[in-house]
A protein has these predicted regions:
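Cyclic nucleotide-binding regulatory module and flanking cytosolic helices
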Residues: 1-28
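A small-molecule sensor/coupling module
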Residues: 91, 110-147, 151
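Cyclic nucleotide-binding regulatory domains
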Residues: 37-98
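Phosphate-/nucleic-acid-contacting segments
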Residues: 146-188
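Residues that recognize and position ribonucleotide moieties
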Residues: 30, 49, 71, 96, ...
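Amphipathic, Lys/Arg- and hydrophobic-enriched alpha-helical face
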Residues: 9, 32-39
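Localized chelating/binding microdomains
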Residues: 14-15, 30, 48, 102, ...
Length: 188
């Protein structure tokens, strides 16, 4: 379990065994069942979650009751409500489990303590955050400028493991199209 977290970190910074144990001491571990909420809109969202096993989605429910999926997170990915996490405010997003899920999570306070104590981890989190901003920009530009088919093709190219693990209704919601439109694309 810890090995996956270490591999994730060491793609960016190298850690000795002692350093990794120190890093790990700032994280906690939790298991969730399928359909269980990790975060609910309106509640505190003090944790950033690293997925060891399972699949989650973050989504927003608008005033009309429509779900808008912002992100999926599977093994070796991170998920949180960034606004609530960094600003220590109530969550705007919901995060729930699409499969039984295992996560390591770190509170914003523990993250700040870790970064203050260890420059390598400050660099790691900076690089992780930058990658998240880049992915968000790519997603926004995709929604603004690509056709439904182009968005679907990009989704399957960027995340080839996800279509087999997700119902088409969730993929359609993520792409900002109806389930019927996704079916008309004649995708498999």
């Amino acid at each position: 379990m810890e090995k996956l977290l270490r591999q994730q970190i060491e793609r960016i910074v190298q850690l000795s065994d002692v350093e990794f144990e120190f890093v790990l001491s700032h994280f906690s571990y939790r298991e969730y069942r399928k359909h269980q909420y990790v975060v609910q809109a309106g509640d505190a969202a003090p944790n950033d979650h690293f997925v060891v096993k399972g699949l989650l989605k973050s989504f927003y429910i608008d005033d009309a009751g429509k779900n808008h999926i912002l992100q999926f997170a599977m093994e070796d990915w991170w998920i949180s409500d960034p606004q609530a996490y960094h600003n220590r405010t109530s969550a705007t997003l919901n995060i729930d489990c699409l499969e039984d899920t295992q996560v390591f999570y770190i509170t914003i306070d523990k993250r700040e303590q870790l970064c203050a104590a260890m420059q390598k981890m400050e660099y790691f989190f900076m690089k992780k955050t930058t990658a998240g901003y880049i992915a968000l920009q790519r997603r926004i530009l995709s929604l603004m400028s690509q056709t439904a088919e182009e968005r679907y093709r990009q989704f399957t190219q960027l995340y080839p493991m996800l279509p087999g693990r997700l119902p088409k209704t969730l993929i359609a919601s993520y792409l900002g199209i109806s389930r019927e439109t996704l079916s008309r694309l004649n995708v498999t």
